[in-house]
């Protein structure tokens, strides 16, 4: 099934629901592929990302992550762990600390800690023509193919449906900062 045929099917289904008394019509959703190009507005960088409905939060590949205080507020300093990224430190306000469940294979038999604590920042990200502010946790993803993983919370912000058989459906990001809204 092509992305266009999926969209037509969804439209037909939503129109058909309107014929059934008391039925709720479908919300207009954007269809994205398993992988999409995403622009990280705050960092002036475009990356290929994996869209993962099984992950709750988004994760960005970062290294040398350290928390610090600035004017009494919590901040985080890090370097992007992405080949084409800049080699200067990035500093952002810390939104919160996220507890991420560790995979069973990553936990030693004598280790009782089943989660890792990761700093979370907010970033303006563009996918297709949609610009949203999402939470992103920082971790070293250099062992993975994609430096950015977009989880279900961010996908909800984009009103996204993910077609796992498609890739780069939205094309190159095309947002302006003036278009930012979570409407």
Name each model-derived stretch.
Residues 1-5:
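N-terminal secretory signal peptides that target proteins for export/translocation
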Residues 25-183:
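Pepsin/retropepsin-fold aspartyl endopeptidases
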Residues 10-20:
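Bacterial N-terminal signal peptides
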């Amino acid at each position: 099934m092509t992305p266009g045929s999926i969209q037509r099917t969804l439209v037909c289904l939503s129109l058909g629901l309107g014929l059934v008394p008391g039925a709720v019509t479908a919300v207009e959703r954007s269809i994205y592929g398993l992988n999409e190009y995403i622009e990280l507005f705050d960092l002036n960088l475009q990356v290929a990302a994996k869209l993962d409905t099984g992950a709750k939060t988004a994760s960005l590949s970062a290294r040398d992550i350290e928390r610090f205080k600035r004017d009494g507020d919590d901040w985080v300093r890090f370097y992007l762990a992405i080949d084409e990224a800049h080699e200067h430190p990035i500093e952002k306000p810390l939104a919160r600390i996220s507890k991420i469940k560790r995979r069973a294979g990553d936990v030693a038999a004598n280790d009782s800690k089943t989660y890792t604590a990761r700093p979370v920042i907010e970033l303006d990200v563009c996918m297709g023509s949609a610009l949203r502010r999402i939470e992103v946790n920082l971790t070293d993803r250099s062992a993975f193919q994609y430096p950015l993983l977009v989880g279900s919370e961010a996908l909800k912000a984009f009103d996204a449906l993910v077609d796992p058989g498609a890739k780069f459906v939205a094309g190159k990001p095309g947002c302006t900062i003036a278009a930012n809204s979570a409407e």
